[in-house]
Amino acid sequence: MASVEAMMENLSWRRTNLRRKINSLSSTSLLPAEILTEIFRLTCQSEDGGLPVTPLFFGGICKDWRETAWSTPLLWNTISLHVSRKAHGSQVQLLRDWLLRANSSPLFIKLTSDDEHESIFCSLRAIMDVLVTRSTYWNSLDSLLPPQCHDILKNNHFPMLTSVSVRPPKGTISTFSEPPNMFLSAPKLLDVDLSGYNFSAMVLPWEQLRRFKTQFLTVAECLKVLKRSPSLKECHLESVYSPEIFPPPMSLDTFYSELEHLDITLIKGAAISLLDSITLPSLTHLRVHYSGAAGFTVSAIHSLVLRSSCNLQRLYIEKQRLDDEDLLPCLESVPSLSHLRLVVVGDSAGLSKKCVSMMHPSRDSGPPLLPKLTWFHYEGPIECDSHSLVDMLSERWCPQPAKNDNTILIASLNTAEIVTHVRYELTDEVECKMRWLTKAGMALSIRSLL
């Protein structure tokens, strides 16, 4: 029996050596270590929607790949853990080994979970206990963060941390939820998402922030964010409300001139008064969303653009209805627009024939609406026949100089997506023209969700 086992062990050893010799003859074995490492790194970073590839995969291929992967810290600088009760023990041990292999590389940390109960919170705390031992190497943190973890973060230093997105458990009421006290220990912090936390309890290095996101603020609190953050480039304010119409200040200045991207979601239509209270000359991207019945007037956007003299390039509006007398003056004030997204959540006053005709390059009364538009998305009621709509889209795909002004250059509309929630008739002629445009290279879609 012993001799048989010895023979089997010898055969296994010979098989391993034979496989290594075969592997040494492959083309990949001739690659320099630097190129192989770069291939590994790019594979780990790929975002194709499938399961992520980790360095552990390469370690299971062969001895040479394992040695390369195990000795390359940059392959281990991304930590993505889906926390569960079953895997808690193995995750903590794997994390310790992972951090050792990451060495001094900047760490990109993401912690998620499908469940939010006490056992998961305990697992998160155990994981955070291990992670803070390398707090000096944190580059970003994206995590569900129960209160049980706050004290762990409090007395640590984060010299490399640039981005933080933390959120309390779903059942937490934001009015009573305080964020962790860690941000003043992060001298390089630029990007903060504190959605779900009480604004008055936020202690942040406001002067250095470039991006900020939160929710459930009054108009007055939104203005405080902008005033405290002169370097802010991008701001996302969700669920903004106003107990009463907030009057604009007597004098408007350009204090917020660094802001380029503003995204606001309103709880009450009166909160649109926020736009009447600011001047943003550097604004290039604006999104305003409100689905309430009362709605808001697009004239607030129109006034902001005129007052700011900004070069707005992307405009996204979502509201109950879009009336021509409200929408068209706003669109006429932003000839610089390249991207437009309009969503009408109601069942009336949507994309009109007048709006479509004003976008046509051959309109009689002057240059077309939005001459630089290259991307157009509309969702809602359509008050224009399909022939007129597709004719306009076709002319914008291959535009000629404006009829009454040859100096105006009209950009090619590369993408157009039109969605309606009711039946919309497309004649055979229209469908034929759409197929031709698609074959020619235009990304065109007109569909009904009915």
Go through each PLM region and give its residues.
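Leucine-rich repeat
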Residues: 1-450
